[in-house]
Amino acid sequence: MYSSSNSFLGGANSTRPGQQPYMQQQPPFSQFGQQQPQNQQTGLAPQPTGYNPQFSALGASQLQPQATGFPPGQIQPQYTGFPGVSPQPQQTQPTGFPASPQQTQYGGFPSLGQAPQIQVTSNTNIPLRTGQQTSSEIANSFQNASVATPTPPPKASGGKIPNIRLSFITAQDQAKFEQLFKSAVGDSQAMTGDKAKELLLRSKLPGSDLSRIWVLSDTTKSGQLLFPEFALAMYLCNLRITGRDIPSVLPETIKNEVSSMVDIISFQVPDTQPEPVAKTNVPSFDAPLLENKLAPPAPQQPRPQQPSNSQLLSQLTAQPTGFPPSSGYQANVAVQGQNQGLVPQATVFPGQASSQNLQPPQMGILNNPQPTGYTGPRPPMPPMPTGFGSNLSPSQTGGLVAQPTGIPGQWGFVNAPASGLPNIEALKQQLMPQPGREGGFSAAGLSGNASIPWAITKEEKKIYDDLFRAWDGLHKGFIGGDTAIEIMGQSGLARNDLEAIWTLADPHNRGRLNMDEFAVAMHLIYRKLNGYPVPNRLPPELIPPSTRNLNDSIGTIKSMLSQDAEHRKATGAFLQPQKTGVSYLKEHSFRGGAVSPGAGRKDATLFKNNDEAAAGYRSSARRRVGNSGRTPSPAASQASEEELSVEQLKKKIRETQIMLDAVDFEDENRAEEEDALDRRDRREAESLMDRIRRVQDDIDTHPHAALRSLDTGAERRTLRRQLQAYEDQVPQIASEVRRVEREIAEAKLELFRLKDAKAHPNSALNIVGTGPGGAVTEADRIKARARARMQARAAELAGRPAPASQDDEEAATRRLEGENARVKAEREKNDSMTRDVEESVKEFARSLEDSLKEGEESSTREHERRRWEDALGVEDVIRDFIYDLNRGSRTAHIRKEEDSRGSSLEPRSRESSAHTSTAARPSPPASVGLTGASPVTHEDRVAAARERAQRRIAERMAAAGLKPQTDAIETLAQRQERERREREERVKRAEEEDAKREQERQRRIAEEQRTPSTQAAKPAGKKPPPAPPRGSRKGRTDSTGQADAKKAAEGSAKTEQLALEQALKEEQQAQEEETKRLETEAKQREDEFAREQQEQEARLRALEEQVRQGKIKKQEEKRRREEAKKAAQEQEARLARQRAELEAAKERERQLQLELEGLDESSSDEEGPVDIATPQDSTPTQSQVLPATSDPEPPAPPTPVAEPPTVPEPEQTTASSSPESSRAVSLRLSPETESKNPYFRRNVSQPTDYPPPTPPEVPQVSSTQMPDTQSTNPFHRLAQQQQPPPPPPTQPAFTGSAPLARKTRARPEADDDWSAAESDFESSDDEDDRAGGGSAKQLASILFGTMAPPRPLSAMDTQSPSSKSATPVQGSSIPPVPPIPAEIEPSSVADGASPPPPPPPPPPPPPAAAPPPLPSAESPAGIPPPPPPPMAPPAPPPPPGPPAAAPAGAPDRSALLASIQAGKGLRKVQTNDRSTSTSAGRVL
């Protein structure tokens, strides 16, 4: 009666899937499985209810297929409750358990204790690569020649490369790479390490570069290369061949493209499954599980400890059946983890605990189907036992949850463990916003044992939604990156995992998560905490419904449009859409139904103008009476009109005319009244506007108008901050007051003690206390009493009267206590006063704060302010009026500022003129004495300068939009008024002083002008008479004394007049200079103020921009760009400086050649030209030590060897690497500006400086990438083999090894585009060419040949312009000459010179150095003068200049010059000073 049920997965008679089909024969069962079922019998064939055994994979060909139970892919056939043919029901049946004294086992559990079980792990979606080398071994094979050939991997079927374009290579290159890849791998999907090595070695690149390329290319670390990885390796080889550097880390875009294509290829590789079996009539349950082929597999859980048989007997539940064969599932988790599509199997009727009550099956020759087992009426499906024994009770199927009823990928329909999701409530409590959430988080308690599917259950979704709502307090509908960092950071996961989870949860790169995306992120975190890896791609089950529905809607719309266009094109409806008569409205539905709610409605495609339906004019249609529709039918009105006579109609017309006239009259009266009201309102509005204008003018012209602040909100906030600052100071001041009061009280007590001790010398109060706080202890009293007794005894012995009777201790204590009480009372009174002041200050501050809060702008007030001040939402007239008022206010404000600036500048100019006139006065003591009583003192000038400084500061603050600090004692208006009065007084005094000074100066000038004229007139009339006596005094015998005296007097008068004129000129010049100086200072001050103001404005703008954007990253980028630009500018300046030095060196060279010509003329025969040959190879290169093969030098005394300058080489390295570092910086910054992942931003916000890779550092890079572990790079050992020996330790002088190494690598060979260093590989490749791999190698050689740059160029020449100078071309140009330090002897100078000088000229001194002094006569012969001191550190060498040919016919001069450079002394320097080279050194 249940045979027609199709409710479970479409199988006939499948309502009870564990039971055999009704009225059909059960296949025979044998103990050892030797009898095969008779699949073809006459009549009805036996229908097995299980699956045919898949013997080919597990080697169980001798076993019989079981009727029900688990598939035999992993367990042995088992019997399900019937003894079958076997007459021994007590024998052990092969049901999966080992042989034991137990009864016949009918359950469906496998033998978990058997040894020969084959466990196939879950598929990793990557081609199985068994029996081959690892990536590390392949990497080592590139460094080691002797490596065993690995066994080839099993070839996967179908080597199809996905049709996906890689953006980092061109389409032509990708096609070439695909051809090369296919020719190399054949039908396989992956290229082995050896094959990749053979192909990549044809690039002729060094092993270090190939090692780094392999590290970057082998993204899966599997020792093989899929096509995208191979294309990436070829791309990196192309980069290195063309001279560019290999990046240390792949860019994000390239890495994402390669990993995505690798995943696609991996998903296309089929799982390793057993061979298919013969087709049977068993229903197939594979289809629902194979619908979603691209979904990642269900996560495989770590295998728990296998239970024993007794534990299995106590834990047995209903047995599921119908499980599809799969190679990736384990039998011990089938009940909880693999129960999709399974129902409990009833193997024995309840109550029939043993098999004796069951009917044995009738098997064999009968044609009719025989019932087996229980033959009674078929009951409903109750919970059934599994037939183990009578002690077992019927087990419920509570371990299984609801079956999936939705489509795959639908949220909320998924099987979860019956015991609930492990520790997800703990995760929810951990991630809820709560105090102390900044602490650490431990994932130790979140490790569950349940196998969680990819999809999110309803319970999980509810928990995640609660978390989202708890964190989304403002109900924005999303959670930003910062909040997500705080939430997800509490999970304790690594930042890389959180970054990957964010990338999966935020597919649109919005930088925030909505509710569904947040649920995805939380689910991935939960799975990661339970030990499952984060997937590379978001599984289809985890795609949020919002995103999926949106994509489906877009696809539906596109399909609708395309189908509509195709339909109209096919039917010809697009030609005349108005005549088709087909409504497309009902077809445009997202629900897919043929009839939509709007189907009865007509759209524009069905519109047709119906002229016949147009009705005539109906007067009743003019007006509607309320909401009751039209007036009564016009038929009645027509009948009534026909009954009226003409007179009646005329009467009605007259009455209607009268009524219309009355209505018109009323309308005219109403219009007149409205006009009158409008005129009155207009007049009132104009009067109000006039009043408003006057009030605004009064406000603008008021002296305190500058104090008016339109930004009341900002001012209110400023006042509130000031009030808060003052409130914060109140407790501190109160504590200071209390401390002072306490000190005053202590001082009063101490003073009272001193006074009391003076008044009562013998009092006990005179005791000095040594206790804490000066308290008098008992020991102090004992000492005082002993001292008093000693004093009395001393007085008695001395015969003095005994001291007065001591005051008792009680009296002293009473006096002290009284004073203490008085001081304490006064202190308490003051303390209470302080508390009162504090409370009053708090109340006052509270009232002020309340008043400030009351004045805050509400929404209504803000609306009103924007309406009446910003003219938003008002009429045009009012808006124009408001704009006019604003313009008038701004004009008045600007005019007032100009007036105030002019008035402030005028006194300043007067003061400056006053100072100018004061400074311009002559400085004789008499003039100072005349103006000694000046009212402008030094204090006044200091005050004026301070005022000017304060005014400038205030102006700058006002220009910057800041408010000056107001004085707490007086208001701003009072202070301005006081300063204005003081300024006016100072201006008045300055004007008076200027007037007095000017009068004094005019008077003095007039007197000085009169004095020379009188003095010039006096010698003519008065001086000659006294002259003879003076002459007679000097020489009385001289007859011409009078004439001489007269001439002397005239000469003295002229001299005095000239002296006066000179003094006047000097005074005028001094005045002019002083005036210019003051003007210059004033101009400098103004320029400084303008510059400071500009800088302040620039800083303010920068701060505002930073606050508005909040992106510190842009500043960092700007700083880097500026540094790069600055470095480039410095490099240009350095090059220009070097060119200038080169020109100076050439000029100096010419001078030295002239000196050498003179030297040759003056030299003797014995010191003739020394034949010294300077071969090319011995010419010192850049920072290179001269080789030992040079000509011997003359013996010289031993001198200390000084280190040559080692500056040019590091600078050159920096200069050459600066473009590469800037390029690397730009490369690292490009993806950062695109991604909004907050973890990625946090990683990138911490700058990482990557050193630019240089050729000597390549082995170090490769070694640091693979520490302590076996390298997976196939090029590692090749790099070690090809690596040159390490350079020797750095000597005091630079050697030329590094530049020469660069030169050999940079130069292209004559006949080939590749370096000849790897020529042996080509010969070995030719020997190893085979039929299978020859074409691939030839293609690789062709490809790498096309990658090479043009032949005249080289890889190192294209890196940077400054690197060209690092490779010297010998004999082609004049290299620069560095400056010579003072402490270096000539030989060391020659050794340490950075660039090689050409044979003719010697190294000249630096151009900025002064020439050394010539040797004096006292200097010993043969000692050259010392070289000039170095003026600047040596610069890096500039690019080589044009070739300069040596002077023809001057080989002797060259040889002599070389000897001079080597330190040879000249003998005849005392005869010819020009013979000594200024660049030669002196032995110290």
Curated annotation (Swiss-Prot):
BP GO annotations: endocytosis; endosomal transport
Disulfide bonds: none
CDD domains: EH
Gene Ontology CC annotations of this record: actin cortical patch; cytoplasm; endosome membrane; plasma membrane
Membrane-related topology note: Peripheral membrane protein
Feature: compositional bias, Polar residues: 1-16, 49-67, 352-370, 628-639, 1175-1187, 1265-1274, 1356-1371, 1472-1484
Subcellular location: Cell membrane; Endosome membrane; Cytoplasm, Cytoskeleton, Actin patch
Biased composition (Low complexity): 17-47, 306-316, 1209-1222, 1382-1393
Bias (Pro residues): 296-305, 1192-1208, 1249-1258, 1394-1415, 1422-1445
Domain EH as annotated: residue spans: 173-261, 460-549
Coiled coil spans: 635-760, 807-843, 965-1011, 1052-1165
Protein keywords: Actin-binding, Cell membrane, Coiled coil, Cytoplasm, Cytoskeleton, Endocytosis, Endosome, Membrane, Repeat
Domain EF-hand, residue spans: 205-240, 493-528
Pfam families with a match to the protein in the record: EH, WH2
Gene3D superfamilies assigned: EF-hand
Chain positions covered by the region annotation Disordered: 1-100, 289-331, 351-384, 615-643, 793-866, 893-1484
Oligomer and partners: Component of the PAN1 actin cytoskeleton-regulatory complex.
Protein name: Actin cytoskeleton-regulatory complex protein pan1
